[in-house]
């Protein structure tokens, strides 16, 4: 069967909470070719639809007969349409627009398929190249300075086999897990001196399932950001702040939360 799910639109819009565990009927509800690149005229309305804003919350999956692992793919184009037209050379998405889409898709448990049409000579047009190059620079700047190792990290709870240090060891197959029975937890990073921070990246250990539903990031007692699901990756950006104690509060989880990835950037 299909292994990736159309996000439900081709404008780059992403859900607030993008779950990879969804009702199995979505596989048949959204044969992408039959709905993609067509007007939303109501013909495809059904009990659950790929265009619905909520397709994976507890309320939605509670009555599902079967659940499947069906991650989202955000599809959009760098241009107004899917093919090259010279008159659109002045209407290419800017690097800032593309960055917002990247952070909302890749940074919120989805993959991103960005259409970049070749011109009539089989080349990528100069305006597209310029926008993409600037996008690459912006992404590199966000993740240029990883300050995680400067902090001492602790968690309110953990099972012995999976301490919090395994969330920051850079290994793909190790992870932190909260103590059995815990559906919320708090992780604290203490820096030896005030450290400028503007971004936190989280990732769950997906072989044990997508679990985290919501959380908050606090900087020295002030809330810096809120987030919903984590999944493969959650990129949390906020106004740069000088902080000595950074706190990540997992406020709701479907069972004991896990993290295979925790990175803090300046």
Walk through the language-model features, giving the residues of each.
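Extended extracellular/luminal ectodomain segments enriched in beta-structured repeat modules
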Residues: 184, 192-199, 243-244
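Hydrophobic transmembrane signal anchors and adjacent membrane-proximal interface regions, especially
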Residues: 194, 227-229
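Short proline/glycine-enriched turn/loop motifs at strand-loop junctions of beta-rich domains
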Residues: 194-195, 210-212
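Mature catalytic domains of secreted/periplasmic carbohydrate-active enzymes
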Residues: 1-183, 189, 201-203, 210, ...
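Short loop segments at secondary-structure junctions
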Residues: 194, 221-222
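Edge beta-strands of jelly-roll/beta-sandwich modules across compartments, strongly enriched
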Residues: 254-266
């Amino acid at each position: 069967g299909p292994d990736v799910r159309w996000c439900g639109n081709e404008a780059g819009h992403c859900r607030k909470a993008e779950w990879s565990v969804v009702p199995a009927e979505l596989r048949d509800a959204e044969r992408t070719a039959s709905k993609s690149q067509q007007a939303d005229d109501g013909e495809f309305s059904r009990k659950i639809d790929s265009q619905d804003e909520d397709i994976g919350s507890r309320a939605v999956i509670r009555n599902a007969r079967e659940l499947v692992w069906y991650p989202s793919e955000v599809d959009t184009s760098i241009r107004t349409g899917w093919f090259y037209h010279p008159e659109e050379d002045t209407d290419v998405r800017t690097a800032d627009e593309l960055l917002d889409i990247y952070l909302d898709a890749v940074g919120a448990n989805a993959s991103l398929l960005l259409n970049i049409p070749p011109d009539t000579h089989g080349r990528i047009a100069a305006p597209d190249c310029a926008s993409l190059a600037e996008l690459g620079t912006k992404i590199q700047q966000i993740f240029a300075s990883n300050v995680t190792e400067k902090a001492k990290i602790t968690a309110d709870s953990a099972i012995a086999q999976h301490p919090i240090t395994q969330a920051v060891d850079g290994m793909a197959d190790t992870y932190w897990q909260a103590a059995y029975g815990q559906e919320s937890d708090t992780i604290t990073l203490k820096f030896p001196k005030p450290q400028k921070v503007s971004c936190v990246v989280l990732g769950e250990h997906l072989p044990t399932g997508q679990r985290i539903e919501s959380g908050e990031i606090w900087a020295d007692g002030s809330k810096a950001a809120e987030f919903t699901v984590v999944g493969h990756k959650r990129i949390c950006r906020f106004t740069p702040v000088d902080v000595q104690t950074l706190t990540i509060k997992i406020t709701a989880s479907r069972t004991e939360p896990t993290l295979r990835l925790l990175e803090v950037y300046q």
